[in-house]
Structure formats: C-alpha cells, structure tokens
Amino acid sequence: HIGALIMLMALSVSVGGVIERSGLMEAVPESFGSVFVAATILFVILVFVGMIMDPFGAVILVSATIAPIAYKNGIDPVHFWMIVLTSFELGYLSPPVALNQLLTRQVVGEKEMDEADAEVRHLSFYYKYERWILPLLVMVPSLLLVVYVPLFFYAK
C-alpha cells in the first residue's frame, strides 16, 4: 500500500510540472476587480490543486505561481497561507484522490476498515458515507470563515 502512495506522490509532482510548464497559471489575471473576487478564485484553484497534488509539490507550485498573484491583489501573506493550508486540507479530504482518507486507511488498517464498512452497509446513505460527508461538512464552512472574515477587517 505504501507503494501506491509513493506512486500517487510521484504522479502529483508530475501533474504540478505539467501545470507549471503549460502556462495554465499565466492564464489567471494578475489583477481582479475586488479582493473578495480574488480570494474566491484563488481558494477554488487551491482546493483543486489540493485534490490532485501531494502537499510538497502543491506548496512549491503555489509559492512560485499563485502567491505573487494573491499579494498583488491585496491579500495579506499570512492570511493567504492560512487560506492555502485550509484549502489544501479540504482538497486532501475530497475525491478524486482523497489523500487524507487513504493515509487514514493505511494507519487504521484494512481489517478495521472492512469491519466498519460491514457495520454500516445496511444503514442510511449518511452512515454509509459518513467518513466522506462529515469532514466536508466541517471543512467547507471553516474554509469560508478563514477566507472571508479577515478580508472584512483589512480589505480596501
């Protein structure tokens, strides 16, 4: 199983290289009409990056390409990196890769996960998919708070 995680990390680093070399990040304008629009677009991009890349490659990609755009649009550096961390965590909890779900499965073990799946197989939709839904129900409002509340205090 650890080989699958290493393969996943290698693939995500290569995806980061493809994104960087393709010029996709240059398509994002350097200036937006409002800091709120900039924050919204940036956190959507960051969640997407968190969904498909490992943490190390994602931080390198963001610090080289997205961070300067955020700074030029008036987002404070500390606030920006808090948005990055929270967005990445939401991405790591979300499909298609769900890296944190995979790592948790590795730590807990296949036997325990199969037992837990067997216990909830006959229950409602929520109980079947609780380990996917509950983190998303917590992280989405948390991300919205982290992104927008500080902007009300320092945005121009």
Language model region names:
Residues 1-156:
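Alpha-helical transmembrane segments of multi-pass membrane transport proteins
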